[in-house]
Amino acid sequence: MASAKGSKPNLPESNIAIGIDLGTTYSCVGVWRNENVDIIANDQGNRTTPSYVAFTDTERLIGDAAKNQVARNPENTVFDAKRLIGRKFTESSVQSDMKHWPFTVKSGVDEKPMIEVTYQGEKKLFHPEEISSMVLQKMKENAEAFLGKSIKNAVITVPAYFNDSQRQATKDAGTIAGLNVMRIINEPTAAAIAYGLHKKGKGEKNILIFDLGGGTFDVSLLTIEDGIFEVKATAGDTHLGGEDFDNRLVNFCVEDFKRKNRGKDLSKNSRALRRLRTQCERAKRTLSSSTQATIEIDSLFEGIDYSVTVSRARFEELCIDYFRDTLIPVEKVLKDAMMDKKSVHEVVLVGGSTRIPKIQTLIKEFFNGKEACRSINPDEAVAYGAAVQAAILSGDQSNAVQDLLLLDVCSLSLGLETAGGVMTKLIERNTTIPAKKSQIFTTYADNQPGVLIQVYEGERALTKDNNLLGKFHLDGIPPAPRKVPQIEVTFDIDANGILNVTAVEKSTGKQNHITITNDKGRLSQDEIDRMVNDAEKYKAEDEENRKRIEARNSLENYCYGVKSSLEDQKIKEKLQPAEIETCMKTITTILEWLEKNQLAGKDEYEAKQKEAESVCAPIMSKIYQDAAGAAGGMPGGMPGGMPGGMPSGMPGGMNFPGGMPGAGMPGNAPAGSGPTVEEVD
């Protein structure tokens, strides 16, 4: 992709940082330049890129190219990695999602979910982090092509309700993609920056961000005043979004097909299901602007065509429980922030699913008729805010971002297990981060030599109902009666929402600590290093494959160009029949070889092109010698010869990539030498 024209970014080259919204279904990337955010289009010209990765017999595809071939290759096209990242295979949400996915998910070490695909004829297993890293790498490449510079630094967004292990896993994905992840920030907070960046000096405002995307849902309540963005409360569901609405529509159509076709069940056919899902997603989008949508698919299953018209009312009925559930976190944040509905100055809708009219209506009714703000693009707001935060962290001195301060919160309470399996909270949810809190604990039994510190996150009274983040031992406590030793435990949560826990025995000063990395769910450093190397290898393979395809296309263009010219009556008249036959025979033989060798190597294609050129170029150049003789010699001071390449393609629709050697030149000039050839209209 050519780099975009425009002035250079106002940061030193090494300091350029991008903001990436890594979405469940689509991702988006932005960069701060010239006092504004540029949302960067991909090589297809789209400002959002599908979070899809496909594996075929020959190549790896990412983004639009992957999504476009999903119906042909459903088992090896991976999406929804965000619904797996940082989770365990046994979690109910993972088990439920697996019923809708055409690709295979298996349980790996420590119940880590592993995605199985066939790539280049071999079975391969990937961690969700690796799939996400491939999407991130694509976003990085899009930004590099746009800026014409190498990029290392990035801010990546996550749902506000992502837990510690999901945040760590997202950070790991960035590392595997070759990025230095400067900060992990919450999606609704990023959207609030997009909303409030240019609204300074208008007094204190309470903003509710309602962020419903493809796979996750967040609500955050912020106070914005003079460039200070303070999150008051956050709530949500990391497993609710547009895909769940798609699933309802798909299930409806599967049952409808069964009813219309004597019980035929297409749900076990992954290709039919994928084609149906694509049309259901399209219908859902149509229903945001029309009152009905028709789903039509030729030969959907066992040769049977399928057609159904779905009204907006029917779609709303299918999903009404989901739609109503979105209001529960809204009530929760208002309660947590100790605020009533009337105190909310603005409701900002973010995420593609907020385009659904019923959701807009429910929010309007909830806020007593208040219209939601539509001044920001729901698909791009999160990446916009991430790009602003990236600029701040990389030291940008622009006026717009200079005085901007972001005060985010931790979304879940953090604590440890005490006697009886009780959850003792040290950091309450919605505490502003970074935060540090210490508390004194003691032993439960006489002469207890050590303690086990078990760290949990969650809101339930007993630890068994919460999420274990990690544990460690503090040993070497001097013998003493119970309740005498003093153990100071400190929880320190950083700006990424990632936790460090330290325990110190006061009398001896003995201490131990843990960075909560959810050892069971998280990748080891060795695994990350291996994945970084694999990512480089896959990237090199992609590049090699691109060059191979270019060489094949070059050979094909050359052959068809010569063939087309030889079929032109005017050109035929200038050549001997034997010469035409020689050229035609060579070209036909090579085209037949091409047909049988679609997967040949780059060198083989280039060798065949040289072979074709060595036979055809001297003969074809005679046409131009005649013309040049009549016109008083060829340009470039070579009477009767050709200047290393043909600056303006041959008549008859011919297009010689890399130029064509003339009569006085060796007949095997490599493709790519000489001026670029353009086709004459």
Curated annotation (Swiss-Prot):
Similarity remark: Belongs to the heat shock protein 70 family.
**This protein's superkingdom?**
Eukaryota
Q: Where is this region: Disordered?
A: 655-681
Q: Which Gene3D superfamilies match?
A: 1.20.1270.10, 3.30.30.30, 3.30.420.40, Actin, Chain A, domain 4, Substrate Binding Domain Of DNAk, Chain A, domain 1
Q: Which UniProt keywords apply?
A: ATP-binding, Nucleotide-binding, Stress response
Pfam family example for this protein? HSP70
The protein's name in its UniProt record: Heat shock 70 kDa protein
Gly residues: compositionally biased ranges: 655-665
UniProt-listed NCBIfam families: PRK00290.1
Question: Which GO MF terms does the UniProt record name?
Answer: ATP binding; ATP-dependent protein folding chaperone
Q: Where is the composition biased (Low complexity)?
A: 666-675
